[in-house]
Amino acid sequence: MGGRRGPNRTSYCRNPLCEPGSSGGSSGSHTSSASVTSVRSRTRSSSGTGLSSPPLATQTVVPLQHCKIPELPVQASILFELQLFFCQLIALFVHYINIYKTVWWYPPSHPPSHTSLNFHLIDFNLLMVTTIVLGRRFIGSIVKEASQRGKVSLFRSILLFLTRFTVLTATGWSLCRSLIHLFRTYSFLNLLFLCYPFGMYIPFLQLNCDLRKTSLFNHMASMGPREAVSGLAKSRDYLLTLRETWKQHTRQLYGPDAMPTHACCLSPSLIRSEVEFLKMDFNWRMKEVLVSSMLSAYYVAFVPVWFVKNTHYYDKRWSCELFLLVSISTSVILMQHLLPASYCDLLHKAAAHLGCWQKVDPALCSNVLQHPWTEECMWPQGVLVKHSKNVYKAVGHYNVAIPSDVSHFRFHFFFSKPLRILNILLLLEGAVIVYQLYSLMSSEKWHQTISLALILFSNYYAFFKLLRDRLVLGKAYSYSASPQRDLDHRFS
């Protein structure tokens, strides 16, 4: 009830949980510890609101014990790219069956055909360009493996040089020869449809490039009228941006080769900096997955259809269905490679250190002690803080996140449970397999039966690896959950 503060009304202090700079340092072990918060404060009496802020003098930031997961086998980059290229070739092959199938089983009274495909209608130059585009990652992995630097024998260095020279020469010659033929045969609109995804490839990936290092946007924003006219400066800035984008793209192209590490520290500012870096790295990997999967599905499902003659009949519904199947399957395979178990565990550790805040209605906690949030404090679980005229409740064991930062909340939501990404991939791949099995049983056309049967094999292999990782990691995290509960009860 409202009223004037009388002489017998108790006044409570609103000191912060810890002084700025009191929580710092780092530890390289798997167990993190934090000092006991010893600020004296008492909670106000709660008038039936159901919310309470625990006495901070008895609160302890519970130490985290990170789970040691087993090292699961990671597929080599060149083998993974070969597997992905083989799956895309299968999808391209079954689409060509859908487009150029024949009626070879008809009697001679009908238009006969001695082959199952109309090979005379297939443009092999277009097929060559499509194959090179689909195999760009595999070609890049071969060149990278053949460009290894170090102490190698003379025979091995000559062999690597010949391999790199042969692959690049054969790819460049085949691509140039096929493109010249296509430029002479088709219209400008067809060629634009063929090549325009590459015009969006670098700019799309460039959006996530760390341009703060190059200060490109700051430089462009501060340019005067005379500098803006200078074409040389623009070209240099654009080339610099392309170089940084391509460097980051090639670093992430082969997944586990460049895996970030986790610094198990107690400094709130360092924890937030680590989370920002991991967010950038994760967004880049997801962008690589999105671009690669859409590009593969585009060249498998849409490009062959666009260059078909108007008088030629094909199943348009099956082409659209194949586009969805290829894009989803490629996305799952790439995410499984770019987001391995060790990387998901790293994100989980960072989310556990970051913590999370839950927004609370101020009317429900008007009689509960609310501490002003400070960025250098490590807040224990259950504490109420006031930030930006709102009230938040600490949810995690460690809580160093900014309460009003939505990106911190999303990061903790996705990665607080280490198996969440793996479960999503497993459910998605399982749904695709169930749909393909249903389509296979209900299919009445021979080319669709062959297509679904071939595509299913690649999805079976991806599903097997996901299920294996899920079972192994599920056991590992369940074993580590019981000691953590005992530790929580000991400090509570």
Swiss-Prot record:
It holds the Pfam family Tmp39. Keywords: Endoplasmic reticulum, Glycoprotein, Membrane, Transmembrane, Transmembrane helix. Residues 1-54 are annotated as: Disordered. GO terms for cellular component: endoplasmic reticulum membrane; membrane. The chain crosses the membrane at residues 77-97, 115-135, 153-175, 185-205, 288-308, 322-342, 421-441, 447-467. It comes from the Eukaryota. It is a multi-pass membrane protein. Glycans are attached at N8. The keyword Endoplasmic reticulum applies. Belongs to the TMEM39 family. This is Transmembrane protein 39B. The lineage of its organism: Eukaryota, Metazoa, Chordata, Craniata, Vertebrata.
